[in-house]
């Protein structure tokens, strides 16, 4: 799958789940489950409830995503 196939959306962290998973509410109101990308995990980026994040979704499964950026 090419990198350009991903859909990027803004969202807010609603809840922290086990195994670095998060429940994220997107701007359009949908709620998805997202995990942290490898570079964020490697650099110990902390994500807390209420943080604004950028989530990448694949066209194949719009209920799961990957957190790629945390806004300050």
Swiss-Prot record:
Cellular compartments annotated: Cytoplasm
Family named by the database record: Belongs to the IF-1 family.
Keyword line: Cytoplasm, Initiation factor, Protein biosynthesis, RNA-binding, rRNA-binding
InterPro entries per the UniProt record, alphabetical: NA-bd_OB-fold, RNA-binding_domain_S1_IF1, S1_domain, TIF_IF1
Quaternary data: Component of the 30S ribosomal translation pre-initiation complex which assembles on the 30S ribosome in the order IF-2 and IF-3, IF-1 and N-formylmethionyl-tRNA(fMet); mRNA recruitment can occur at any time during PIC assembly.
Protein name (record): Translation initiation factor IF-1
Domain S1-like, residue spans: 1-72
Entry's Gene Ontology molecular function annotations: ribosome binding; rRNA binding; translation initiation factor activity
Pfam families linked to this entry: eIF-1a
Gene Ontology CC terms: cytosol
Main function: One of the essential components for the initiation of protein synthesis. Stabilizes the binding of IF-2 and IF-3 on the 30S subunit to which N-formylmethionyl-tRNA(fMet) subsequently binds. Helps modulate mRNA selection, yielding the 30S pre-initiation complex (PIC). Upon addition of the 50S ribosomal subunit IF-1, IF-2 and IF-3 are released leaving the mature 70S translation initiation complex.
Main localization of the protein described in the UniProt heading: cytoplasm
Entry-linked NCBIfam families: infA (TIGR00008)
